[in-house]
Amino acid sequence: MGASREKKQQIVAEFKDKLSKAQTVIFTSFSGLTVEDETVLRRKFKEANSEYKVYKNTLMTIAARELGYGDDLIKYFEGPTSVAFGYEDPVAPAKILTEFMKDHKGLELKVGIVNGKIVSPQEIEALAKLPSREELLAKALGSMKAPITNLVFVLSGTLRSLVYALNAIKEKKQAEA
């Protein structure tokens, strides 16, 4: 019995660690998914530097209480519950799950935690519609690059006009001579 208790304590510690490190945590009900569906979903999470796991509800309850979460989160730990962790991009888990739910009706959002705040399934779906971190960085870089590019075009246009004007003056002087 001691080894089983130690194993459970390790699982609680692992879950607490993941819950603390993740920017986004989404709890789902997966009762209608096949093992093959779960494998595909895990692979998608791995590709996005995220994680998808199943924990026992009782162990998640212990870990959540130890981290200071109350019944507003723990009440969702009923029935088959899986957990998606997003470490780098807070939008990635929401995007993966909502996209996967379109083709797999057995997967349902229960509740989420985004940067320590408990969020509803509707808020998770809204989060999924936001651009990813990489997309936002690309847009920011593009908007910073645009004024510089425009300045280059304006300056090169001005220089080009100056060259044409000087060339015209040169040709006029040569024609007069």
Curated annotation (Swiss-Prot):
Signal peptide: none annotated. Keywords: Ribonucleoprotein, Ribosomal protein, RNA-binding, rRNA-binding. One of its GO terms (molecular function) is large ribosomal subunit rRNA binding. SUPFAM superfamilies: Ribosomal protein L10-like. One of its GO terms (biological process) is translation. InterPro entries: Ribosomal_uL10, Ribosomal_uL10-like_sf, Ribosomal_uL10_bac, Ribosomal_uL10_bac_type. GO terms for cellular component: ribonucleoprotein complex; ribosome. It comes from the Bacteria. It holds the Pfam family Ribosomal_L10. Belongs to the universal ribosomal protein uL10 family. Forms part of the ribosomal stalk, playing a central role in the interaction of the ribosome with GTP-bound translation factors. Part of the ribosomal stalk of the 50S ribosomal subunit. The N-terminus interacts with L11 and the large rRNA to form the base of the stalk. The C-terminus forms an elongated spine to which L12 dimers bind in a sequential fashion forming a multimeric L10(L12)X complex. This is Large ribosomal subunit protein uL10. It comes from Caldanaerobacter subterraneus subsp. tengcongensis (strain DSM 15242 / JCM 11007 / NBRC 100824 / MB4) (Thermoanaerobacter tengcongensis). The lineage of its organism: Bacteria, Bacillati, Bacillota, Clostridia, Thermoanaerobacterales. The gene is rplJ.
